[in-house]
């Protein structure tokens, strides 16, 4: 495992997934994580009772206290044990606590960080512009490595075939040459042209010019200017469950139109469902770093740049 990856922020859930007095279980980098809330406060902990290692996800919540199902140990919202039923009169040591994680709440999503030393949060420019509506979608579970999922997101040549009559049409599959710039901060591809009959659920067809960004190993985005003052952005977040399984969330940002949140989510659900069986079928499961293992062509420029970016950062997770 690359320590560098653990320093990044990962989407653990949408806020709507967390219900009062219920424990939500997730998996991140093969670690079991629980999420629960009391009113507006969200707690994200390791799924492990400090006493005898039982899963706290089997426990219960009442009045802002999480109770372990095994011996009834009770933990407050600061992850500190406040009651040991078998010895109610003892002074509870400070080490009787659950490991908790840093949390960022933004755009109706919850991010966590598994490291004490964190990288900067990926802050998309449109996040801070008040005229943009935002809709979070997911989770989408994909039995594929995180790099495979990201590379598919960056690939436009599959649009006419996997997303026919939505993101592309089979009689217009050509991808013109486009520009790619790589740096230590990521990748930027511009002037990516593709004909699309219904690219964002608005049923407006025509040639679309995209720009793509890789912000960190497992965060990428695409954007397009619909008109001079109208812009569409889709951010793609991959949270690794394991080296060969991923949890995906997307964030749609638009400063035009008045689409219902459900319509946006339904469209994203539909598009992602088309991608899943394709990406899950790819072999090898781990993304090859040796570019000679597969045959690449000009339209693969951004995926080649992505593989070189991972290699330059010495990423070994999800790759071969």
Range-by-range predicted roles:
Residues 4, 11-129, 134:
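Rieske [2Fe-2S] iron-sulfur-binding domain
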Residues 8-10, 31, 99, 174-176, ...:
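Short beta-strand or tight-loop elements
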Residues 1-4, 318-320:
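Basic/polar N-terminal segments that are highly enriched at the extreme N-terminus
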Residues 118-320:
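C-terminal catalytic domain of Rieske-type non-heme iron oxygenases
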